[in-house]
Amino acid sequence: MIIDAVLNLVGKPYLPGVKPSLAKLPTDIKIVDVGTGSGCIAITLKLEIPEAEVTAVDISDKALEVAKQNRNKFDAKINFLKSDLLERIDFKPDVVVANLPYVDKDWDWIDKEALSKEPEIALYAGDHGLALIKRLIDQITKRAIPFLVLEADPCQHEDILNYARKKGLEKLETRGFVITLSNPQVSH
């Protein structure tokens, strides 16, 4: 789970009794949630790490409107920005989290009927579902951002990790659908 991975980075494990295994960051960090959708990840991170500055970005006006409505329900102090990935972010975050579209339309094993309830822009990506993830990894390395926590299908993890290594990122952890990457060129 993305939330658990970020809490692990700041030494605040989500589950009671679990020792943090990464604990590399203070809690007053800047977090950007790329592809925020409904805002649930950004909202939960802000509620779990109140001292963090959380910015939620999405390319969809409709998604941002839903995320703002959800933020208001929880009174979470979150910034919102319409942006194609990190293009309009004018500061350096400590952590970027992303649950981007990663489904390949050619996958014959997915339940297309179940997915039909979601907007296509929130589900599908080209390049075997990796197009947006690769663009984000490129932006992470170009901007020297210390950490990236992202969700992808486990069948994609090897390709993502190989691409990330070519770009200079290192795997800190994979758990379920979540990959945590570190940029060793940046002091943490």
Segments predicted by a language model, with ranges:
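SAM-dependent Rossmann-like transferase core, predominantly class I methyltransferases
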Residues: 1-50, 60-66
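Short beta->alpha hinge that forms the Motif I/post-I loop of the SAM-binding pocket
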Residues: 36, 58-61, 132, 152
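Short alpha-helix adjacent to the SAM-binding motif of class I
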Residues: 62-73, 135, 162-163
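Conserved SAM-binding strand-loop segment of SAM-dependent methyltransferases
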Residues: 74-85
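Short conserved loop adjoining the S-adenosyl-L-methionine
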Residues: 85-92
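Short SAM/SAH-binding signature in class I
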Residues: 93-99
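Mobile active-site "lid"/loop adjacent to the S-adenosyl-L-methionine
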Residues: 100-132
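Conserved Class I SAM-dependent methyltransferase catalytic core
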Residues: 127-183
